[in-house]
């Protein structure tokens, strides 16, 4: 019976693992003459090359250093007059706020509650839990955050109809009781809006504005046209609403928010004349959501009548304009160019990885390609000192045999029998000599193969030629 080999101790296995950790691996280049595999390899390389050349370098301009979010300054000015049923309105009345910043509102409809004074009056019927039948239904001193004043505890008739509501102490009459509506949008589409915008990219020390370098009379006679006059930033309000895809009359009655987006995408490798603003317009508030669509706000005008403080409450519906500026500037830089070139060259290796996987998974009959692909070379064993060899020569005895890897002849004999050994002899695999060694192994990860060759012969690279016909195809 064959003696059972004891399992290697843990310490020995750890030493073997530590020794294997310091092994060096280097690629081995083999040429596989296979047309379908070559087509796949070149196709993958071509796709990767097109991706980097067209998308990365041409579209994304990855060879440039870039900066996003320019420093921006915006000044706006509105001009025009309009009229309601009984009044003419000018800019000072329908533009809020009047400072001319990046966000402003143009009032297109108002609901006016005039001559409000401090007193007691019926609460609005739209306030929750305000309808009543008796005074007991109203709690004196109660303050509703959604109401218009402090409840007095009385139940009084409403402004119109037969309903009753709780009486409150505050500004009277309340908004529902005496509000009058005025439409200001009749001439509003012809309002003109001047938008002055200047941007600065600090990384590249580049600045530019959206107004052409001309005299002062230029802005008095021009209007914006993206094709013919892009540096005249004077827009008609009707043009802005139309470009946003909205109906002006509907928007003027309910109000809404329109965004004027100015985009500065600049390629600073080109002259500054190629860096031009691009304008786009869209509605920003969700018009299809009834609970949040529209735009309105309230303000009041105070005055005194017969020594009594009086105010006019105005609920204003309007078109709010938000001017939004964004952009990106890019300029050639060596560092991102080198990084992206290195990434491109490295990514081409994906084709080799894919083809290796196809080769070794689907085309590796009889492990022909594995034997050619993987080799493991062991360093020749050297004695720690020459005194055993010298002593043996003096005594006339054979020197001690060196420790070396198993010969390919021996491995071939064990693996495939005498016939494989004869094939190994025909390929030049001889018995190793004890003094000149060149060890290697093919497709045998846990064993090293030693091979002795004369000094004039080069070592063979493939030690297990199991299929000569398959090897001839490589």
UniProtKB/Swiss-Prot annotation:
The chain crosses the membrane at residues 43-60, 334-354. Pfam families: P2X_receptor. InterPro entries: P2X2_purnocptor, P2X_extracellular_dom_sf, P2X_purnocptor, P2X_RECEPTOR_CS. Residues 316-329 are annotated as: Pore-forming motif. It catalyses: Ca(2+)(in) = Ca(2+)(out); K(+)(in) = K(+)(out); Na(+)(in) = Na(+)(out). Glycans are attached at residues 129, 190, 247, 306. Belongs to the P2X receptor family. This is P2X purinoceptor 2.
């Amino acid at each position: 019976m064959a003696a059972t080999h004891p399992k290697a101790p843990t310490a020995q296995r750890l030493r073997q693992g530590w020794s294997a950790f310091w092994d060096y691996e280097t690629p081995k280049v083999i040429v596989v003459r296979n047309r379908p595999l070559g087509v796949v390899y070149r196709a993958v390389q071509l796709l990767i090359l097109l991706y980097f050349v067209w998308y990365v370098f041409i579209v994304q301009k990855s060879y440039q250093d870039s900066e996003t979010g320019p420093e921006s300054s915006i000044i706006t000015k509105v001009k025009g007059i309009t009229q309601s049923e009984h009044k003419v309105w000018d800019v000072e009345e329908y533009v809020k706020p009047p400072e001319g910043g990046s966000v402003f509102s143009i009032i297109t409809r108002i609901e006016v509650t005039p001559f409000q004074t401090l007193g007691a009056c019926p609460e609005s019927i739209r306030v929750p839990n305000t309808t009543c039948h008796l005074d007991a239904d109203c709690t004196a001193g109660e303050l509703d955050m959604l109401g218009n004043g402090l409840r007095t505890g009385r139940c009084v008739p409403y402004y119109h109809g037969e309903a009753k509501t709780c009486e409150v102490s505050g500004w009277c009459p309340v908004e529902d009781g005496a509000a009058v509506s005025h439409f200001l949008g009749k001439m509003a589409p012809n309002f003109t809006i001047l938008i002055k915008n200047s941007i600065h990219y600090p990384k590249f020390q580049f600045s530019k504005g959206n107004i052409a370098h001309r005299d002062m009379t230029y802005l008095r006679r021009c209007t914006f046209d993206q094709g013919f006059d892009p540096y005249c930033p004077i827009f008609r309000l009707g043009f802005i609403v139309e470009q946003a895809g909205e109906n002006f009359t509907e928007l003027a009655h309910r109000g809404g928010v329109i965004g004027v987006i100015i985009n500065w995408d600049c390629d600073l490798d080109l002259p500054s004349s190629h860096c031009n603003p691009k304008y786009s317009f869209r509605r920003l508030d969700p018009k299809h959501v009834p609970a949040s669509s529209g735009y309105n706000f309230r303000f009041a005008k105070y005055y005194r009548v017969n020594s009594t403080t009086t105010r006019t409450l105005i609920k204003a519906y309007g078109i709010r304009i938000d001017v939004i500026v964004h952009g990106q500037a890019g300029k050639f830089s060596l560092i991102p160019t080198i990084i992206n070139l290195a990434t491109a060259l490295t990514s081409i290796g994906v084709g080799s990885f894919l083809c290796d996987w196809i080769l070794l998974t689907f085309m590796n009959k009889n492990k022909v390609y594995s034997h050619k692909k993987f080799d493991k070379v062991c360093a020749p064993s050297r004695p720690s000192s020459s005194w055993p060899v010298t002593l043996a020569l003096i005594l006339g005895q054979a020197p001690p045999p060196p420790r070396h890897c198993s010969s390919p002849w021996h491995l071939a004999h064990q693996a495939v029998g005498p016939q494989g050994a004869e094939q190994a002899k025909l390929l030049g695999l001889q018995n190793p000599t004890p003094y000149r060694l060149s060890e290697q192994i093919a497709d045998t990860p846990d064993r090293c193969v030693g091979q002795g060759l004369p000094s004039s012969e080069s070592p063979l690279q493939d030690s297990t030629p199991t299929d000569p016909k398959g090897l001839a195809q490589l």
